[in-house]
Structures are given as C-alpha cells and as structure tokens.
Amino acid sequence: MTTIYLIRHAEAEGNLYRIAQGQANSSITDRGERQIQALARRFADIPIDAVYASDLYRTCATASAIYKPKGLPLHRRRDLREICVGVWEEKTWGEIARQDPAQLENFNHRLHLWHVEGAETPQAVQTRLLAAVRDIAAANDGKTAAVFSHGCAIRLLLAALQGIPLEELGKTPTGSNTAVSLLRAEGARIQVVWRDDASHLTDPAFTQGCTVKQRANGLEPGLYFRPLAREQAEFPAAWAGTSGAPPAGAPVLAGYLDGTPVGAVAFDDGRESERGCGWIPLLAVAEPWRRRGYGVQLIGQAVMHYRPMGRDRLRLPTISMLIQRMRWN
C-alpha cells in the first residue's frame, strides 16, 4: 500500500491578483510564503519518502516545505500541472467574464460543458492526473509520498476517485491554498481517506483578505481594465501637488467591475528604471470599493506591466497618496 498526501500549492500571484494562471508560471505571494511555513510545521513529524510536484514554480516552491527539511530530492512532473485554460491564460477573471460570460458560467458551474480555444478538456485532466498518481503509487509501494498539484486539477482528480461525475463537480469544493488530501493506493484501487484539509492555517493572516472563497459555485469577481484618457479623470489635488502629474503619454489603467469604475493605476516607465524599479505614480480606489481586495488587483496590473521590462520591484508614493479618491466623469 502507498500513502499519498495530495497538496495544493500556496497562494500565488494569480490567486491574489485574480488572473487566470492555468499553466502559466507565477510567483508565490508573501501570504503564500507564510502558508508554506505552516505546511512545513504540519509535516515536520510526518515521515515522507518521496516528494513530487508539477514543474510549475508555484508547486515546486510549495513542495520546499517538505523536501528541503527532510533532505529529499524533488521529482518534477509535467503531468501534475493545472488544467490548461487556453486563450484564457493570464487574463483577468473580470476580462474573461466580460468577453466570454457563457463559458465562464460553464467553468464555474458546468465544467463538463466548458471548452475554450487551446484549452484541455476536464476529462483529459482527469486521465492525466489519474495516470500520474497511479505511476507514483506504483513507484512507492509500501512508502509515503507527498504530491503537489493545483486547485482545479486536484478537484477533478478527487471527483474521479470518489466516483463523482463531472456533471456534479459544481457541488464539490476547491481546497484552499496548501489544503491537504490523503489518498491510499493498493493495486489499481485508490481511496480518498479525507480531502481539502487546511487545519494548519490556524492564523487568520493566512487567509484574511483572500479574494477567492472556498465555495462550490465559483470564483469571486475580478476587475477588467481599460486605458483611461487623462481627461476622463480629475487626479487628486493632493497627489498631483506631491508627485506631479504623470509624464505625457504615461499609461493609466482604470479597473471596472460590471461596468462600474473601481480605481486606477498609472505607470511611469522611465522613472527609476536604472534601479530596476517599476514606478507607480498613482494608485487610487474609489471610496465605496476600498478594503474589498480591489487595490491589490491594480497592483497586479503593475506587476504584469513592469515584469516584461525586467523590473524586479515596485515603487509607490507615500501611503497617504495611495488612497486618494478618484472622481469619474
């Protein structure tokens, strides 16, 4: 018999910024790093003989909670990857909701009907994950393995193992980041002993402010973004007086939720470029939308804007400037 701990990766940028990451690589957030530390404490006294992870960064980084303290090698496997979401990759969920609402509804509630250009089918993901787990179980007979994968992939695998048809997948939860499921494999049979346990995340800071709730019926809403013409917004006087207006031609993105403007972020590509910084001269969230997780989605757009330029950090004005109110025409 083989014991397998099946573990979802820690919080990554796509989770935080509300971006469809699928098989795209993304970094672990600060909260994700704390989740990894909590996971390491959980497994400190649990014997593990082998550690496997998908070859994406977020799973490999999460797997360090186990393989590094125990001095084990990490076995990277492409067949443990998340479902490929095709043309949705690296789009915001808000943009997807605007462009393809019918398929997003299918993705959230009727995954067996979902398909977009370039994407894997859910059935293909189940076949891929089942084969991977069976191969790992056979290679570790009589041992215990930790296997790191992704939210949708794990959900599909557990449904297949529990005999839940794809038509009823919407009734099952998606485990939290670093949630653990326990499998026992003997021959061709793989039993789900328990699933989606995140009891190691005892500190509210591990989950407070998360933009994705663990629920069966879908995802929290995200923003979509459009370029904002300077004449469309009156920049806050206090901000302009301190930092000066963005240089001519500097891009400004407005974030919208269901057609309603929520906030804006501006970029100054030339400022502090020699220091590897991405300068954000303005980050503004309108009063009704503050403290609801939308400001960090604006930050996510700055990350996506500056990372291809090789910038490895962001700089913002003083904190008093970060929450200035934006007025919209």
What are these regions (language model features)?
Residues 5-72, 76:
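Active-site-proximal alpha-helix that buttresses catalytic centers in soluble enzyme cores
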Residues 31, 289, 293-301:
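Conserved acetyl-CoA pyrophosphate-binding loop and the N-cap/start of the following alpha-helix
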Residues 70-128:
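Phosphate-handling substructures
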Residues 79, 283-290, 318-320:
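A short, internal acetyl-CoA/4′-phosphopantetheine-binding micro-motif in the GNAT/acyltransferase core
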Residues 87-95, 160-230:
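Acidic, low-complexity terminal tails and accessory targeting/binding regions
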Residues 157, 296, 308, 320-329:
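Conserved active-site alpha-helix within GNAT-family acetyltransferase domains
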Residues 230-282, 286, 299, 305:
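Acetyl-CoA-dependent GNAT
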Residues 306-318:
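Conserved GNAT acetyl-CoA-binding A-motif
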